[in-house]
């Protein structure tokens, strides 16, 4: 399979016309969007995407054999051909999306929510190699970009952030990068490079697999358990970043006090800072999970399928909204695939509520919420028990799925809890493995 990774390299502050280039490109996209909205009925009659694009370009660009219908070349003289085509493609996509949404709205018979075609856009130009972007000699933190200085398109030498370039040389040397895209974040400009890799995911049989089951929590960031198909636990790891969470909760307290006195209108910058802290925390958690799985030679990383719907209320509302569970799983999936590992998800119902030893529901410790008490009186870490159950559910599903129907029915009769994925626990996996060994020996 293919994996696509990207990295943004910061453009160091200097006197180069990046803003003027961005403005003229967005003006071109807006102008083209207006044009293609007018002639969309004729363009829509062309089914082939390539022919439609050629017809759209002929409307605005004059050649020796083709006089243009619209004055795009006069409004935007000497615009590089690749940049012009990128603007055409963006405008065609905007109009096509608008027309599709309009058709769906008209068919639905709704009177509200009418789609609107936005001419003001946030399009970012792509600097195609050789014609818009040239690399400096290897080892130098410089590149050449073709930019618009207000009068003409000229080549400008731009200085790139040394730390970012060192990262690319260290991790992506020898791999081909796509044409960089301009990006603006936090009042800074970046060139984002994308890299495509061919990776082969592991095909280890289920009975020989080693998995890393992960329970994502709010109080503890993540608990990982390394497990075999027979239920043998090879390792456990608690991942927690208390200082990062403390910093984030401290900023949330400041926001709360500020909004109490001044309202929420002026707290936008504070929320943006908190969001960036939360994103960085998600990156660290995902990196730690994948690193632990790789060190233990895991074939699969197993998560809960976390779906939170409905209104969240109460004192934990803010924490739950900032819980980046999907982002962590998405980052882990990308990093795991790059290393050849697979990612799987299991039903999340009752993983924390049921004790891993099969004794039934647990009671949370009132003084320490991370601990729970089993019905046998045993005190145990609740997240660790949940990670055992997550790994067990994965193996129960995969082991039963690969068996013939008659053999599966026989095992389900001997171990009834495995029929329901919402209630099976780690003890059921141990019992299932025992019954499979007995059946194999018979």
What annotation goes with each model-predicted range?
Residues 1-442:
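Nucleic-acid substrate recognition interfaces
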């Amino acid at each position: 399979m293919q994996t696509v990774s990207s990295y943004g390299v910061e453009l160091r502050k200097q006197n180069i016309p990046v803003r003027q280039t961005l403005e003229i490109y967005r003006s071109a996209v807006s102008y083209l969007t207006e044009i293609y909205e007018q002639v969309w009925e004729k363009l829509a009659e062309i089914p082939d995407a390539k022919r439609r694009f050629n017809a759209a370009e002929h409307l605005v660009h004059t050649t020796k054999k083709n006089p243009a219908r619209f004055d795009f070349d006069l409004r935007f003289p000497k615009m590089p051909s690749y940049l012009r085509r990128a603007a055409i493609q963006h405008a065609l996509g905007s109009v096509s999306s608008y027309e599709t949404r309009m058709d769906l709205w008209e068919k639905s018979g709704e009177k509200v929510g009418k789609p609107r075609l936005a001419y003001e856009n946030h399009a970012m130009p792509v600097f195609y190699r050789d014609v818009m972007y040239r690399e400096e000699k290897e080892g130098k933190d410089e590149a050449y970009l073709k930019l618009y200085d207000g009068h003409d398109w000229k080549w400008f030498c731009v200085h790139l952030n040394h730390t970012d370039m060192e990262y690319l040389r260290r991790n992506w040397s020898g791999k081909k990068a796509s044409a960089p895209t301009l990006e603006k974040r936090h009042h800074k400009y970046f060139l984002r490079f994308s890299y495509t890799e061919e990776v082969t995911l592991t095909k280890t049989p289920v009975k020989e697999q080693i998995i890393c089951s992960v329970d994502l929590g709010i109080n503890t960031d993540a608990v990982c358990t390394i497990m075999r198909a027979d239920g043998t636990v090879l390792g456990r790891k608690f991942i927690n970043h208390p200082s990062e969470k403390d910093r984030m909760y401290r900023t949330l307290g400041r926001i709360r006090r500020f909004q109490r006195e001044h309202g929420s209108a002026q707290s936008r910058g504070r929320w943006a800072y908190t969001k960036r802290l939360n994103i960085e925390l998600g990156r660290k958690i995902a990196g730690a999970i994948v690193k632990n799985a790789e060190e233990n030679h895991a074939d699969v990383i197993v998560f809960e399928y976390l779906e939170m719907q409905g209104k969240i209320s109460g004192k934990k509302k803010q924490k739950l909204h900032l819980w980046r569970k999907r982002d962590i799983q998405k980052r882990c999936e990308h990093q795991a695939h790059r290393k050849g590992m697979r990612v799987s998800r299991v039903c999340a119902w009752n993983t924390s509520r049921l004790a891993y030893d099969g004794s039934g529901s647990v009671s949370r410790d009132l003084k320490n919420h991370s601990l729970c008490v089993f019905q046998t009186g045993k005190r145990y870490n609740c997240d660790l028990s949940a990670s055992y159950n997550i790994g067990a559910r994965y193996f129960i599903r995969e082991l039963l799925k690969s068996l013939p129907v008659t053999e599966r029915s026989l095992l389900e009769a001997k171990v009834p809890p495995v029929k329901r994925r919402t209630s099976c626990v780690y003890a059921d996996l141990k019992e299932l493995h025992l019954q499979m060994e007995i059946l194999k020996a018979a």
